[in-house]
C-alpha cells in the first residue's frame, strides 16, 4: 500500500532553492580550503605556430621572480602526462594531446603556462608579464579552407593535421548514423516542387553564469578535486589517465553547478594543470577561468553550413530529402555537430541522403551545446519545410501534418510513444493559427510588421546505466545518493520526489545527494537523460528499500505489524524509529541498466508557435508571444518542467537573434563581444505538456525535457519574420542589418 501523499507530478519547490536565494549555496569557487594558493592561466595569442623555447625560458624566469609567485608551470617543466584511453577521446570532445606537452600552437587560447602565487592578485599580475615569441605557421581557420584536404593521422606523433573527414556515427551510437542513405531518387521531372538552399549557423558560446573553477588538493597520494563539472565519474577516469594514478586515489566533488549547457560535461585541460600545479607547490591550488578564457577553453557550438534539398509532389508530399552538413573541429580532438540526425526520422521521405563532413582547423575544440545537432539542424530543416509549403501554397502546419512519420524513418521501429499530431492541434488552437493569413506582410500593429511562425521540436529519449546508494539514518531518515549533478535543472528535487513516492515515505523523510564521485557512478548530466537514467536507479533503490522494510515489518516477531498482509502496509504511517531499527538491512547500493531500446524508437516531440513584431525602420525584431506544446512522457514536476522549456526557448531566441562569437579574420582572435537575451527579450509564454507516460524507456515513464525547448526555436522565429516581412533569412543570427529597410539618400540612392 502506497502513501496517500503522492508527490510525483506535483509542483514541489526546489529542495536547494532556499540556499540559492539566500546565498548559502556554495559553488566550486566558494569552497574554502586552508592554505589555498591561486593559479592563473597564460594562453597563446596565435592560431598556429610554435613558441620559441628561449622566450618561454626567459618569461618563466622573469615571472618566477615576481612578488608572491610560488611556481610557473610551462611546457619546459611540466611533468609528462599520460594518454587518455581511446573510449574517452573517440567522438568525444576530449583532447588527445596532453596539455603543455610541447611548444606547438594549434589554436588561439591554447594553454601555455600556469602561474601560481600566494594571492589571486599576485598571480594575475605575474601572469600579465609572461610574454613569448612565436614562429608563426600558416593557419587554417575555416572549414572551406581545408575541404579538399583529407585528414589523416600522423603515424609517428598520433596527432591529426588539417583536413576534412566523414565521421560514421555520433558519439559511438550505432543508431545515429552521420552518413545515411535510403531509397531511390525520384524520376527526373516527376515532382514539380523543390527547395534547394544553404543555411548557416555561427559559433555559439555556452556562457553559463558560473565560470569554470577548479580546486586541487593533494593529501599524500590522494587527490581531491573540487570542480564545476557535470561528469564527475568521467573526470575521475580522465584525471587518473593523465596523472597515471589509480582512480580510487581521486575524489571529484561538484555539489552545485551554476549552469553549463554542455560546457562542463567533460574534462578540460585547466583541471589537469591545476592538479599538477598543486602537487608542484605542495598546497591546494584554485584556478578560475576568466570570461574571455571560457570562449577558448571549455568548448563551443561549432559553425555549420547546411545544404537542404527537398522535392515534393504538387500536393506537398515529400518524395526526396537531402541534408548535407559541413562543420568544424580542432586538430586535437574528435567532434562532429550532428545537424542532420533529426532529418533522418522526422518526416516521411522515400528517398533520403544525410551526410556530415567535419573539418579539422586551427580552432579550440568544440563540444556539445544545448540541443547538439538538433538546434542548428532543425533550423535548416524547418525553414526549408516552410519554404516548401510556400511553393506548394499549403499552410506550413498542414504540410507537416501531411508528411508526418508514423514510425521511425531511420530504423523502421515503431515509436514508444508519439503524440506530435496532438501537439500540433493543441498548439494551433491555443495560438489561434487558423486566423493566420497566408500572404507575408499581411499583419501590422502600431506601425510595425507582425508575423506568425511555427516549427516542429524533437529530441531523442536517452537512458544510460547508473547507480544509487541508500542509507537509513538513526532517526529513520532515508538518504539516496548518486554521482550525478545539480546543474540548475532541479535533479535533487525530482529525485527526492521519485524516492519518496516509490518508497512510500513522506517527502520530508527523504533526501537526495549528488556531486561526489564516491557515490555510485552515473553518466554526465546532458543529452536530456538524467531523469530517465538516475531516476531509474533511484526508483530501483527506493522500490528495494520498500520491499525490504515491509518484509522486516511483517516477518519480525517483535514488530507491531508481525504477520500482517504486506499489501496493506502503509509505510508512511510507520514510526520512523522503526525503520532505524533495521538500519543495516535498509542501507545498500543498487543500479539500473540502460533499458531496452532495441524494439522501439524513443523520441520526444513538440510544436512551437510564435508571433514576432518587426520594426523595419530600426531593424528590431521582437518576439511577443510563444505557444509550446510538448510530448515528453510523464511530467514529474510541472513547475520545473515549465522552467526547463521556458529557459530552452529563451536559449533558442538568443541563437535566432543575437548570439555569435565574432572573430578577427586576420588573427583568429575572438573579439570579446557576445550578446545574450535578457528578461526584456522574453515573450509571453504559454507552455503545456501532454503528460503521456512512456514506460518503454524507464520505469517512471519520463523522456528528456532539457533540450527540446531550444530545438526548433530559431526556425519558428525565422519563419515568423518571413511572414512579417517577406524576407527569407537563412543565416543565423538574424540581425538588424537583415531587417532594416535601406535608407534612401536624396536623389533616390540607397
Report residues per predicted region.
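Flexible, low-hydrophobicity surface segments
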Residues: 1-165, 270
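Phosphate/diphosphate-binding loops
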Residues: 118-119, 283-327, 539-560
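Extended active-site and interfacial segments that coordinate phosphate-rich ligands
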Residues: 12-19, 128-135, 230, 237, ...
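Helix-loop-helix junctions that connect adjacent transmembrane helices in secondary transporters/permeases
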Residues: 153-243, 404-477, 670-686
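C-terminal catalytic domains of large/alpha subunits in multi-subunit enzymes
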Residues: 66, 75-77, 244-251, 279-285, ...
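Short acidic, glycine/serine/threonine-rich loops at helix termini
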Residues: 82-87, 126-129, 236-238, 261-267, ...
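Glycine-rich loop/linker segments at domain edges
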Residues: 15-22, 87-91, 95, 167-214, ...
Amino acid at each position: 500500500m502506497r502513501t496517500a501523499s503522492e508527490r510525483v507530478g506535483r509542483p514541489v519547490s526546489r529542495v536547494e532553492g532556499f540556499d540559492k536565494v539566500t546565498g548559502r549555496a556554495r559553488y566550486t569557487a566558494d569552497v574554502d580550503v586552508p592554505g589555498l594558493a591561486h593559479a592563473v592561466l597564460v594562453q597563446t595569442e596565435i592560431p598556429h605556430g610554435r613558441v620559441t623555447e628561449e622566450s618561454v625560458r626567459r618569461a618563466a624566469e622573469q615571472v618566477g621572480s615576481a612578488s608572491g609567485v610560488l611556481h610557473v608551470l610551462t611546457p619546459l617543466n611540466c611533468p609528462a602526462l599520460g594518454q587518455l584511453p581511446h573510449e574517452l577521446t573517440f567522438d568525444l570532445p576530449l583532447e588527445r594531446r596532453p596539455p603543455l606537452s610541447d611548444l606547438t600552437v594549434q589554436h588561439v587560447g591554447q594553454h601555455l603556462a600556469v602561474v601560481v602565487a600566494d594571492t589571486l592578485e599576485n598571480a594575475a599580475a605575474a601572469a600579465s608579464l609572461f610574454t613569448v615569441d612565436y614562429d608563426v605557421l600558416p593557419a587554417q581557420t575555416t572549414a572551406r579552407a581545408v575541404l579538399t584536404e583529407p585528414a589523416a593521422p600522423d603515424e609517428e606523433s598520433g596527432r591529426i593535421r588539417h583536413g576534412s573527414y566523414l565521421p560514421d556515427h555520433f558519439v559511438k551510437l550505432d543508431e545515429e548514423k552521420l552518413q545515411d542513405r535510403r531509397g531511390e531518387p525520384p524520376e527526373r521531372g516527376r515532382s514539380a516542387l523543390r527547395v534547394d538552399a544553404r543555411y548557416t549557423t555561427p559559433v555559439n558560446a555556452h556562457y553559463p553564469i558560473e565560470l569554470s573553477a577548479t580546486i586541487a588538493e593533494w593529501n599524500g597520494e590522494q587527490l581531491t578535486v573540487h570542480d564545476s563539472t557535470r561528469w564527475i565519474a568521467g573526470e575521475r577516469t580522465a584525471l587518473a589517465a593523465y596523472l597515471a594514478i589509480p582512480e580510487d586515489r581521486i575524489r571529484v566533488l561538484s555539489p552545485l553547478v551554476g549552469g553549463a549547457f554542455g560546457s562542463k560535461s567533460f574534462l578540460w585541460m585547466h583541471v589537469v594543470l591545476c592538479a599538477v600545479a598543486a602537487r608542484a607547490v605542495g598546497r591546494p591550488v584554485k584556478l578560475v577561468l576568466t570570461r574571455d578564457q571560457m570562449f577558448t577553453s571549455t568548448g563551443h557550438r561549432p559553425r555549420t553550413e547546411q545544404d537542404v534539398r527537398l522535392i515534393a509532389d504538387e500536393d506537398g508530399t515529400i518524395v526526396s530529402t537531402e541534408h548535407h552538413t559541413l562543420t568544424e573541429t580542432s586538430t586535437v580532438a574528435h567532434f562532429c555537430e550532428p545537424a542532420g540526425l533529426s532529418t533522418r526520422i522526422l518526416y516521411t521521405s522515400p528517398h533520403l541522403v544525410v551526410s556530415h563532413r567535419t573539418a579539422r582547423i586551427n580552432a579550440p575544440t568544440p563540444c556539445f551545446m544545448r540541443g547538439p545537432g538538433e538546434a542548428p539542424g532543425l533550423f535548416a530543416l524547418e525553414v526549408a519545410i516552410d519554404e516548401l509549403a510556400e511553393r506548394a501554397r499549403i499552410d506550413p502546419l498542414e504540410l507537416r501534418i501531411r508528411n508526418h512519420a508514423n514510425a521511425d524513418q531511420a530504423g523502421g521501429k515503431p515509436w514508444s510513444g508519439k503524440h506530435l499530431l496532438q501537439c500540433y492541434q493543441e498548439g494551433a488552437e491555443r495560438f489561434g493559427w487558423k486566423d493566420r493569413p497566408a500572404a507575408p506582410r499581411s499583419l501590422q500593429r502600431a506601425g510595425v510588421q507582425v508575423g506568425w511562425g511555427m516549427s516542429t521540436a524533437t529530441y531523442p529519449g536517452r537512458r544510460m546505466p547508473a547507480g544509487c546508494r541508500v542509507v537509513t539514518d538513526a532517526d529513520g531518515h532515508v538518504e539516496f545518493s548518486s554521482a550525478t549533478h545539480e546543474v540548475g535543472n532541479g535533479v535533487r528535487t525530482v529525485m527526492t520526489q521519485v524516492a519518496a513516492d516509490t518508497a512510500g515515505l513522506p517527502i520530508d523523510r527523504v533526501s537526495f545527494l549528488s556531486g561526489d564521485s564516491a557515490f555510485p557512478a552515473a553518466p554526465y548530466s546532458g543529452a536530456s537523460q538524467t531523469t530517465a537514467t538516475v531516476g531509474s536507479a533511484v526508483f530501483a533503490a527506493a522500490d528495494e528499500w520498500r520491499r525490504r522494510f515491509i518484509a522486516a515489518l511483517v516477518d519480525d516477531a517483535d514488530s507491531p505489524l508481525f504477520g500482517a498482509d504486506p499489501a496493506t502496509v502503509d509505510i508512511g504511517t510507520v514510526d520512523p524509529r522503526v525503520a532505524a531499527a533495521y538500519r543495516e538491512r535498509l542501507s545498500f547500493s543498487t543500479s539500473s541498466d540502460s533499458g531496452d531500446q532495441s524494439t522501439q524508437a524513443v523520441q520526444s516531440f513538440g510544436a512551437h508557435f510564435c508571433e514576432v513584431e518587426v520594426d523595419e525602420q530600426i531593424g528590431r525584431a521582437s518576439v511577443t508571444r510563444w505557444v509550446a506544446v510538448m510530448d515528453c512522457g510523464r511530467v514529474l514536476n510541472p513547475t520545473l518542467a515549465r522552467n526547463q522549456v521556458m529557459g530552452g526557448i529563451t536559449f533558442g531566441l538568443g541563437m535566432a537573434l543575437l548570439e555569435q562569437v565574432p572573430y578577427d579574420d586576420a588573427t583568429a582572435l575572438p573579439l570579446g563581444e557576445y550578446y545574450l537575451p535578457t528578461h526584456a527579450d522574453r515573450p509571453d509564454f504559454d507552455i503545456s505538456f501532454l503528460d503521456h507516460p512512456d514506460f518503454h524507456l524507464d520505469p517512471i515513464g519520463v523522456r528528456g525535457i532539457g533540450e527540446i525547448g531550444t530545438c526548433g526555436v530559431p526556425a519558428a522565429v525565422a519563419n515568423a519574420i518571413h511572414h512579417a516581412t517577406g524576407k527569407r533569412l537563412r543565416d543565423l543570427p538574424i540581425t538588424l542589418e537583415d531587417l532594416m529597410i535601406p535608407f534612401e539618400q536624396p536623389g533616390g540612392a540607397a
